[in-house]
Amino acid sequence: MGISKKSLISVTLVLFLIVSIGFLYVFNPIQTKPKRVGVLFYQSNPTTLRFLAGLKTGLAKQGYYQGENLDLVVENFQNSTPKVTMATLRKIAQKRVKVLITTGKDLTITTAHTFRDKPIIYTLVSRPITKETIQTIIDEKNITGVSYFTPYDRTLELAQRIIPHFKRLTLILPPHSAWTDYKRLSEAAQKTGIQLNQIATPLPDLERTILNLKGKTDAIFLPYDIQLIFRAGLLKAALIKASLPAISNNLEYQSGCVLTYYAEPETIGEIAGQMAVKIFHGAKVKYLPIELSSYYKLTINKALLEKLNFSIHEDVLSYANEVIR
Protein backbone atom coordinates (compact mmCIF):
# COMPACT_ATOMS: atom_id res chain seq x y z
CA MET A 1 0.00 0.00 0.00
CA GLY A 2 1.66 3.25 -1.14
CA ILE A 3 1.88 6.57 0.65
CA SER A 4 0.01 9.40 -0.98
CA LYS A 5 1.87 12.50 -2.13
CA LYS A 6 -0.18 14.63 0.27
CA SER A 7 0.75 12.42 3.25
CA LEU A 8 4.42 12.50 2.26
CA ILE A 9 4.39 16.30 2.17
CA SER A 10 2.70 16.44 5.59
CA VAL A 11 5.24 14.07 7.13
CA THR A 12 8.09 16.07 5.59
CA LEU A 13 6.74 19.33 7.03
CA VAL A 14 6.36 17.80 10.50
CA LEU A 15 9.91 16.46 10.40
CA PHE A 16 11.18 19.85 9.22
CA LEU A 17 9.44 21.60 12.13
CA ILE A 18 10.83 19.11 14.65
CA VAL A 19 14.36 19.52 13.30
CA SER A 20 14.02 23.33 13.24
CA ILE A 21 12.82 23.48 16.85
CA GLY A 22 15.60 21.14 17.92
CA PHE A 23 18.17 23.25 16.08
CA LEU A 24 17.00 26.42 17.79
CA TYR A 25 16.98 24.74 21.18
CA VAL A 26 20.51 23.38 20.80
CA PHE A 27 22.24 26.30 19.11
CA ASN A 28 20.44 29.31 20.56
CA PRO A 29 21.97 29.93 24.02
CA ILE A 30 19.34 32.48 25.02
CA GLN A 31 16.61 31.04 27.17
CA THR A 32 13.17 32.59 27.54
CA LYS A 33 13.53 33.06 31.30
CA PRO A 34 15.49 36.30 31.95
CA LYS A 35 18.90 35.99 33.57
CA ARG A 36 18.94 38.08 36.73
CA VAL A 37 22.21 39.84 37.62
CA GLY A 38 22.85 41.89 40.76
CA VAL A 39 25.06 44.94 40.13
CA LEU A 40 26.23 46.46 43.42
CA PHE A 41 27.97 49.84 43.50
CA TYR A 42 29.73 51.27 46.53
CA GLN A 43 28.88 54.72 45.21
CA SER A 44 27.35 56.34 42.15
CA ASN A 45 29.82 58.42 40.15
CA PRO A 46 30.97 58.90 36.53
CA THR A 47 33.13 55.77 36.72
CA THR A 48 30.36 53.43 37.88
CA LEU A 49 27.82 54.91 35.45
CA ARG A 50 30.16 54.38 32.52
CA PHE A 51 30.99 50.91 33.82
CA LEU A 52 27.27 50.09 33.83
CA ALA A 53 26.95 51.28 30.23
CA GLY A 54 29.87 49.04 29.26
CA LEU A 55 28.33 46.10 31.13
CA LYS A 56 25.08 46.47 29.19
CA THR A 57 27.05 46.67 25.93
CA GLY A 58 29.06 43.56 26.78
CA LEU A 59 25.90 41.60 27.61
CA ALA A 60 24.12 42.86 24.49
CA LYS A 61 27.01 41.70 22.29
CA GLN A 62 26.39 38.22 23.69
CA GLY A 63 22.66 38.44 22.97
CA TYR A 64 21.35 39.53 26.38
CA TYR A 65 19.17 42.65 26.55
CA GLN A 66 17.76 44.43 29.59
CA GLY A 67 13.98 44.06 29.73
CA GLU A 68 13.97 41.07 27.39
CA ASN A 69 16.08 38.11 28.47
CA LEU A 70 18.09 40.02 31.07
CA ASP A 71 17.14 41.60 34.39
CA LEU A 72 19.82 43.84 35.91
CA VAL A 73 19.16 44.56 39.58
CA VAL A 74 21.27 47.69 40.22
CA GLU A 75 21.81 48.91 43.78
CA ASN A 76 23.83 51.89 45.00
CA PHE A 77 25.14 51.58 48.57
CA GLN A 78 26.50 55.11 48.88
CA ASN A 79 26.07 56.45 52.43
CA SER A 80 24.36 53.20 53.49
CA THR A 81 24.75 52.17 57.11
CA PRO A 82 25.75 48.53 57.80
CA LYS A 83 22.14 47.82 58.80
CA VAL A 84 20.74 49.29 55.56
CA THR A 85 23.38 47.45 53.51
CA MET A 86 22.41 44.09 55.01
CA ALA A 87 18.69 44.78 54.52
CA THR A 88 19.29 45.63 50.86
CA LEU A 89 21.40 42.52 50.31
CA ARG A 90 18.66 40.36 51.82
CA LYS A 91 16.15 41.88 49.37
CA ILE A 92 18.50 41.07 46.50
CA ALA A 93 18.81 37.51 47.80
CA GLN A 94 15.04 37.12 47.55
CA LYS A 95 15.21 38.04 43.85
CA ARG A 96 17.33 34.93 43.18
CA VAL A 97 20.07 36.54 41.12
CA LYS A 98 22.26 34.30 38.97
CA VAL A 99 25.45 36.37 39.25
CA LEU A 100 26.62 39.29 41.41
CA ILE A 101 28.86 42.05 40.06
CA THR A 102 30.45 44.20 42.77
CA THR A 103 32.70 47.23 43.26
CA GLY A 104 34.64 48.09 46.40
CA LYS A 105 36.47 45.58 48.58
CA ASP A 106 34.35 46.06 51.72
CA LEU A 107 31.08 45.74 49.80
CA THR A 108 32.42 42.65 48.03
CA ILE A 109 33.35 41.02 51.33
CA THR A 110 29.92 41.78 52.83
CA THR A 111 28.23 40.45 49.69
CA ALA A 112 30.27 37.24 49.81
CA HIS A 113 29.25 36.67 53.42
CA THR A 114 25.59 37.12 52.46
CA PHE A 115 25.64 35.11 49.21
CA ARG A 116 27.96 32.23 50.00
CA ASP A 117 26.83 30.12 47.06
CA LYS A 118 26.58 32.82 44.36
CA PRO A 119 29.26 33.64 41.76
CA ILE A 120 30.76 37.10 42.29
CA ILE A 121 32.58 39.22 39.70
CA TYR A 122 34.63 41.82 41.60
CA THR A 123 35.36 44.80 39.33
CA LEU A 124 37.02 48.22 39.01
CA VAL A 125 40.02 47.09 41.06
CA SER A 126 43.07 49.32 40.59
CA ARG A 127 45.55 46.47 40.87
CA PRO A 128 45.43 42.81 39.80
CA ILE A 129 43.21 40.82 42.14
CA THR A 130 45.23 38.28 44.09
CA LYS A 131 44.49 35.76 46.79
CA GLU A 132 45.65 38.38 49.31
CA THR A 133 43.11 40.87 47.95
CA ILE A 134 40.23 38.64 48.94
CA GLN A 135 41.78 36.61 51.77
CA THR A 136 39.09 37.81 54.18
CA ILE A 137 36.31 36.52 51.93
CA ILE A 138 34.89 33.18 53.03
CA ASP A 139 34.90 31.21 49.76
CA GLU A 140 37.25 32.74 47.25
CA LYS A 141 36.45 29.92 44.80
CA ASN A 142 33.22 31.78 44.08
CA ILE A 143 34.99 35.02 43.20
CA THR A 144 36.66 36.21 40.02
CA GLY A 145 37.00 39.71 38.66
CA VAL A 146 38.27 42.43 36.37
CA SER A 147 41.14 44.67 37.43
CA TYR A 148 43.73 47.01 35.94
CA PHE A 149 47.18 48.40 36.70
CA THR A 150 47.13 52.13 37.38
CA PRO A 151 49.71 53.49 34.88
CA TYR A 152 51.68 55.82 37.16
CA ASP A 153 54.81 55.90 34.95
CA ARG A 154 52.90 57.06 31.89
CA THR A 155 50.85 59.51 33.96
CA LEU A 156 53.95 61.28 35.26
CA GLU A 157 55.64 61.28 31.85
CA LEU A 158 52.62 62.98 30.29
CA ALA A 159 52.36 65.44 33.18
CA GLN A 160 55.98 66.49 32.64
CA ARG A 161 54.99 67.66 29.17
CA ILE A 162 52.27 70.04 30.32
CA ILE A 163 53.41 71.24 33.76
CA PRO A 164 56.36 73.68 33.59
CA HIS A 165 59.51 72.60 35.47
CA PHE A 166 57.73 69.60 37.00
CA LYS A 167 60.19 68.18 39.53
CA ARG A 168 58.22 68.05 42.80
CA LEU A 169 54.98 66.14 43.39
CA THR A 170 52.93 66.09 46.58
CA LEU A 171 50.53 63.27 47.41
CA ILE A 172 47.66 64.36 49.66
CA LEU A 173 45.89 61.80 51.84
CA PRO A 174 43.61 61.98 54.87
CA PRO A 175 44.90 60.28 58.03
CA HIS A 176 44.39 56.49 58.08
CA SER A 177 43.64 56.37 54.35
CA ALA A 178 43.14 52.91 52.86
CA TRP A 179 45.11 53.86 49.72
CA THR A 180 47.88 51.28 49.28
CA ASP A 181 49.70 52.28 46.08
CA TYR A 182 52.32 54.63 47.52
CA LYS A 183 55.16 52.25 46.69
CA ARG A 184 54.23 52.03 43.01
CA LEU A 185 53.73 55.79 42.71
CA SER A 186 57.06 56.37 44.47
CA GLU A 187 58.85 54.00 42.08
CA ALA A 188 57.30 55.78 39.09
CA ALA A 189 58.36 59.17 40.47
CA GLN A 190 61.91 57.98 40.99
CA LYS A 191 61.99 56.57 37.47
CA THR A 192 60.89 59.89 35.97
CA GLY A 193 63.16 62.05 38.13
CA ILE A 194 60.40 63.52 40.28
CA GLN A 195 60.66 64.09 44.03
CA LEU A 196 57.56 62.68 45.75
CA ASN A 197 56.35 63.95 49.11
CA GLN A 198 53.36 62.71 51.06
CA ILE A 199 51.17 64.81 53.34
CA ALA A 200 48.48 63.44 55.64
CA THR A 201 46.00 66.19 56.37
CA PRO A 202 42.74 66.16 58.35
CA LEU A 203 39.77 66.70 56.06
CA PRO A 204 38.73 70.05 57.63
CA ASP A 205 42.24 71.36 56.85
CA LEU A 206 42.33 70.39 53.16
CA GLU A 207 42.03 73.91 51.76
CA ARG A 208 44.59 75.38 54.16
CA THR A 209 47.02 72.53 53.43
CA ILE A 210 46.79 73.09 49.67
CA LEU A 211 47.20 76.87 50.00
CA ASN A 212 50.30 76.33 52.16
CA LEU A 213 51.84 74.14 49.44
CA LYS A 214 52.05 77.02 46.96
CA GLY A 215 55.72 77.47 46.02
CA LYS A 216 56.68 74.24 47.80
CA THR A 217 55.54 71.78 45.14
CA ASP A 218 54.98 71.79 41.38
CA ALA A 219 51.88 69.60 41.35
CA ILE A 220 49.43 67.69 43.54
CA PHE A 221 48.55 64.03 43.06
CA LEU A 222 44.97 63.08 43.94
CA PRO A 223 44.67 59.34 44.73
CA TYR A 224 41.64 57.08 44.86
CA ASP A 225 40.33 57.80 48.33
CA ILE A 226 36.60 57.89 49.04
CA GLN A 227 36.93 60.67 51.61
CA LEU A 228 38.76 62.89 49.12
CA ILE A 229 36.47 61.99 46.22
CA PHE A 230 33.48 63.21 48.21
CA ARG A 231 35.32 66.55 48.48
CA ALA A 232 36.40 66.83 44.84
CA GLY A 233 34.65 70.20 44.44
CA LEU A 234 36.41 71.66 47.47
CA LEU A 235 39.76 70.33 46.22
CA LYS A 236 39.24 71.91 42.80
CA ALA A 237 38.43 75.32 44.31
CA ALA A 238 41.46 75.19 46.63
CA LEU A 239 43.82 74.15 43.81
CA ILE A 240 42.67 77.03 41.60
CA LYS A 241 43.03 79.46 44.51
CA ALA A 242 46.59 78.22 45.11
CA SER A 243 47.39 78.19 41.35
CA LEU A 244 48.53 74.58 41.70
CA PRO A 245 47.96 71.92 39.02
CA ALA A 246 46.71 68.47 40.00
CA ILE A 247 46.95 65.13 38.23
CA SER A 248 45.10 61.89 38.86
CA ASN A 249 44.13 58.46 37.57
CA ASN A 250 40.50 58.76 38.66
CA LEU A 251 37.58 60.20 36.73
CA GLU A 252 36.00 61.65 39.86
CA TYR A 253 38.69 64.36 39.95
CA GLN A 254 38.62 65.07 36.21
CA SER A 255 37.21 68.60 36.35
CA GLY A 256 39.84 69.70 38.88
CA CYS A 257 42.91 68.11 37.28
CA VAL A 258 44.99 69.33 34.36
CA LEU A 259 45.59 65.69 33.41
CA THR A 260 43.63 62.52 34.12
CA TYR A 261 44.90 59.19 32.80
CA TYR A 262 42.45 56.47 33.70
CA ALA A 263 41.39 52.90 33.00
CA GLU A 264 38.40 53.01 30.67
CA PRO A 265 35.32 51.93 32.70
CA GLU A 266 33.25 50.89 29.67
CA THR A 267 35.87 48.33 28.66
CA ILE A 268 35.98 46.89 32.19
CA GLY A 269 32.18 46.70 32.12
CA GLU A 270 32.22 44.86 28.80
CA ILE A 271 34.70 42.31 30.13
CA ALA A 272 32.51 41.78 33.22
CA GLY A 273 29.52 41.23 30.92
CA GLN A 274 31.42 38.60 28.93
CA MET A 275 32.36 36.81 32.16
CA ALA A 276 28.74 36.87 33.35
CA VAL A 277 27.59 35.21 30.11
CA LYS A 278 30.16 32.44 30.57
CA ILE A 279 28.66 31.81 34.02
CA PHE A 280 25.15 31.80 32.48
CA HIS A 281 26.30 28.99 30.22
CA GLY A 282 27.69 26.86 33.03
CA ALA A 283 31.27 28.05 33.54
CA LYS A 284 32.57 27.53 37.07
CA VAL A 285 33.91 30.69 38.70
CA LYS A 286 36.93 28.94 40.17
CA TYR A 287 38.07 28.13 36.62
CA LEU A 288 37.51 31.65 35.26
CA PRO A 289 40.81 33.56 35.30
CA ILE A 290 40.83 37.09 36.64
CA GLU A 291 40.85 39.47 33.67
CA LEU A 292 43.19 42.44 33.37
CA SER A 293 42.04 45.46 31.37
CA SER A 294 44.81 47.42 29.65
CA TYR A 295 42.78 50.09 27.87
CA TYR A 296 43.33 53.61 29.18
CA LYS A 297 42.13 57.09 28.24
CA LEU A 298 43.76 60.49 28.59
CA THR A 299 41.86 63.68 29.43
CA ILE A 300 43.59 67.04 29.19
CA ASN A 301 41.84 69.94 30.90
CA LYS A 302 42.75 72.80 28.56
CA ALA A 303 40.37 75.22 30.28
CA LEU A 304 42.14 74.66 33.60
CA LEU A 305 45.59 74.95 32.02
CA GLU A 306 44.60 78.33 30.60
CA LYS A 307 43.24 79.44 33.98
CA LEU A 308 46.61 78.53 35.54
CA ASN A 309 48.44 80.41 32.73
CA PHE A 310 50.28 77.29 31.57
CA SER A 311 51.48 77.01 27.99
CA ILE A 312 49.68 74.30 26.05
CA HIS A 313 51.65 71.85 23.96
CA GLU A 314 49.62 70.82 20.94
CA ASP A 315 51.53 67.54 20.60
CA VAL A 316 50.26 66.46 24.04
CA LEU A 317 46.71 67.49 23.13
CA SER A 318 46.97 65.21 20.10
CA TYR A 319 47.39 62.23 22.44
CA ALA A 320 44.28 63.09 24.44
CA ASN A 321 41.08 61.09 24.03
CA GLU A 322 39.21 64.04 25.50
CA VAL A 323 40.05 67.73 25.81
CA ILE A 324 38.07 69.85 28.26
CA ARG A 325 37.84 73.33 26.73
Residue ranges of each PLM-predicted region?
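Short hydrophobic alpha-helices and adjacent helix-cap/hinge residues
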Residues: 2-325
